[in-house]
Design a protein with these regions (language model features):
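Positively charged n-region of N-terminal signal peptides that target proteins for export
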Residues: 1-4
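Active-site and adjacent substrate-binding regions of carbohydrate-active enzymes
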Residues: 21-576
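Bacterial N-terminal signal peptides
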Residues: 8-16
Length: 576
């Protein structure tokens, strides 16, 4: 086992395995794995303890008015289906007014629903309908930039100083000594104002100004974080939160949460988010926030209830290590049937974040999202996807599903890059597949008028077909979500102890514990039979298989498991 992982495993007093042949994974445990059943619940809304989130991309979920674009009324009409999955919360991508150069993340009015989605009253009614079904709803909050068409930015372009002049990061001149080191992040010659503005993603998304952690005295345009104009911007962004919380949403997913304060090591940005947390706790107690930061230990210290673990090294080892799935590096995903992946590298990175964040908040490992290729790609089958769901729904923290993954919607290739959907993002934002009618039931318009093309393959999955099949992926996902929602050992904060994880080997096994309630989860994505064994530090009751397929043998405190190719097994191994 790699040395860095040994440090992580030893820190939970578990074990080191002796490596053996690739196809014979039975190993000789050295010491007992320490499972205590103790766990500390972070400060978080109580409903998050069992939460399973379902991400809906509004423009491609359901078109209720026949214009080819999904809308809020369409989501309302499909809430009974969402509820039937067993999920407890919904995350909605941006529905604000926008020119849609970046699919709505380029906002022109934070206080108004874009007409293509409906009205503010539709949003308020959607929130109420979600609550009526016993679910919660969070919305995307985009604090780091706006569209160049936003009235604030247009006002900041005026050469005459005004309220908005410093709400965006502008230099004092278009040409100045030392400008070369800034040019890569700034846009020149856009308007009559003499200066360059910083962009925070695409060029047309100017960065809102939260100040500089360490302003350069030679560059007076680098304002400190407590500058009066910056404080005014921060208060306005709090007003945006107030507006939507008053409308009925339960919280926010914070886009690019770590990219606010410039020249920052993260500490100043964290300080800002702590002030936001204090304001929310005072005025809107129980508000849930999840960051797009990808450094959970930093994000939860900043007051977030959770943070996504998906952008950086470690996550790719699970589902998208290959270059065909990402543009960063090459390798083998652990959750592929070829069975060439390595779970230890994921654990090395994940455990480093987990141990430093678990007492303060949660890690959210997403199945996918609007920026990631769908998990069903490059030959993965429904059987492969079921193993992924078993893993994701039994890990600690808050699971986030992406719409359509529950039926195995595929990543589509070679689609036009509309609204900024570059880097493979076009293929993961296609319309939801409801039935076998034209456009898979998403819309009644002719196909050429669709916002995005739908999967027209003969074997394209759909909800209605899978509803009829008790063995379908959809129904298996429902069973796993039900398990997640009812087992005390699967609460978000329940103990997590890896018990079988060897470099380049399968399966991966771990225990979730809450008091004397213990579950052993074993996943085998590889297309071969595998087995493994380990020793427990406690005397357990007779193991019982409660989900999946596999065999288990208990000899005193030693447990041995065996799994078929591409399978998972969940056993109850409660303490006596």
């Amino acid at each position: 086992m790699i040395k860095k992982l040994v440090v992580s495993i030893v820190s939970i007093a578990c074990f080191i395995f002796i490596g053996q042949a690739q196809d014979a994974a039975i190993t000789s445990p050295k010491t007992a794995c320490i499972v205590t059943g103790k766990a500390q619940r972070p400060v978080s809304p109580a409903w998050v303890d069992k939460a399973v989130f379902y991400q809906i991309y509004p423009q491609t979920y359901y078109d209720s008015n026949g214009d080819g674009v999904g809308d809020l009324q369409g989501i309302i009409e499909k809430l009974d289906y969402v509820k039937s999955l067993g999920v407890t919360a919904i995350w909605l991508n941006p529905f604000y007014e926008s020119p849609f150069r970046d699919a709505g993340y380029d906002v022109t009015d934070f206080y108004k629903v874009a007409p293509r989605y409906g009205t503010n009253n539709d949003a308020k009614r959607l929130f109420a309908e979600v609550h009526k079904r016993g679910m919660h709803v969070i919305i995307d909050y985009v604090p780091s930039y706006t569209s160049i068409d936003h009235p604030w930015f247009k006002a900041s372009c005026d050469p005459k100083p005004n309220k908005y002049s410093n709400w965006y990061v502008w230099t004092n001149s278009t040409w100045f000594p030392g400008m070369d080191k800034y040019k890569a992040d700034f846009i020149q010659g856009y308007c009559e104002r003499d200066g360059m503005f910083m962009n925070n993603f695409f060029w047309h998304q100017p960065a809102l100004n939260y100040g500089y952690a360490k302003p350069d005295p030679q560059q007076p345009w680098q304002l400190p974080t407590n500058h009066p104009d910056i404080m005014a911007l921060k208060e306005e962004m709090k007003n945006v939160m107030r507006f939507w919380l008053n409308m009925g949403c339960d919280g926010f997913r914070i886009d690019m949460a770590g990219s606010l304060v410039k020249k920052d090591d993260g500490s100043e940005t964290s300080k800002y988010w702590k002030t936001v947390r204090e304001f929310l706790d005072k005025e809107y107690p129980g508000t849930f926030t999840v960051a797009e930061w990808s450094y959970p230990k930093d994000a939860v210290r900043g007051g977030f209830n959770a943070d996504f673990f998906h952008w950086f090294n470690g996550y790719d080892d699970l589902f998208q290590k290959e270059k065909i799935r990402n543009s960063n590096h090459d390798g083998h995903s652990y959750f592929d049937s070829e069975g060439k992946g390595d779970i230890t590298h994921f654990l090395e990175v994940y455990l480093d974040q987990y141990y430093d964040s678990r007492d303060n908040g949660y890690i959210a490992v997403p199945f996918g999202n609007h920026d990631l290729v769908r998990i069903k790609n490059n030959g993965r089958t429904d059987k492969d996807i079921a193993v992924i769901f078993a893993f994701m729904l039994t890990m600690p923290g808050t699971p986030f599903m992406y719409y359509g993954d529950e039926i195995g919607m595929r990543q589509l290739e070679d689609l036009p890059h509309i609204e900024g959907s570059y880097m493979g993002r076009a293929g993961d934002r296609t319309p939801m597949q409801w039935n076998n009618a034209p456009n898979k039931g998403f819309s009644v318009v002719s196909p050429e008028k669709l916002y995005r093309a739908v999967d027209v393959s003969n074997d394209a999955p759909d909800v209605v077909s899978q509803e009829k099949d008790p063995n379908s992926l959809l129904n298996r996902v429902r069973e796993l979500i039900k398990l997640h929602n009812t087992e005390p050992a699967l609460l978000a904060y329940a103990e997590f102890v890896p018990v079988y994880a060897e470099k380049d080997k399968y399966p991966f096994a771990y225990i979730r514990g809450n008091g004397k309630d213990r579950l052993l989860i074993v996943v085998n994505p590889a297309n071969r039979e595998v087995s493994g064994s380990f020793i427990l530090n406690y005397k357990c009751q007779k193991p019982k298989l409660i989900s999946g397929k596999g065999t288990i043998l208990l000899e005193e405190n030693k447990i041995s498991v065996n799994l078929e190719p591409v399978s998972y097994a969940i056993f109850r191994i409660n303490e006596v």
